[in-house]
Amino acid sequence: MVTVTLISKPQARVGGNFRVIKIPEECYRCKLYGICMGRLRPGRAYRITEVRPLKYPSPYKCLLNGDEMVPVVVEEENLILPIKLPYIIEGSITSFDKSWCICHPCPSEEALPSRVKIIKVIDRRQCGSGWFFLVEAKPLD
């Protein structure tokens, strides 16, 4: 999913990646929250695909670091997830059950999607008496 958000000017470069670990308390009080951190999900990773130009210096400064904020287009990165199903078809859409994270580490619980699109099957592994697939998946929520 493509999203326009704000990032500090020193970090705004095409191809740059960042992960939102947690939204700081200061962000909730900021008047830019709705177009900045409010558009991102904790635990998810993003890649900057475009830096939008500003004709004038931005009057908006980040409450955390004091940097000038600039608009960027970001795309959510795919997740590596375990899927415990009898078979997997790349391109298919399936629900995701967080109980599948027992045998393979998953992103933080708040970052886990309820539905995913399978992009690529990476591996098939055994867990206890069963098997699961390790996949690259695009979150759909």
UniProtKB/Swiss-Prot annotation:
InterPro entries: UPF0179. This is UPF0179 protein Cmaq_1008. It comes from Caldivirga maquilingensis (strain ATCC 700844 / DSM 13496 / JCM 10307 / IC-167). It comes from the Archaea. HAMAP family: UPF0179. Belongs to the UPF0179 family.
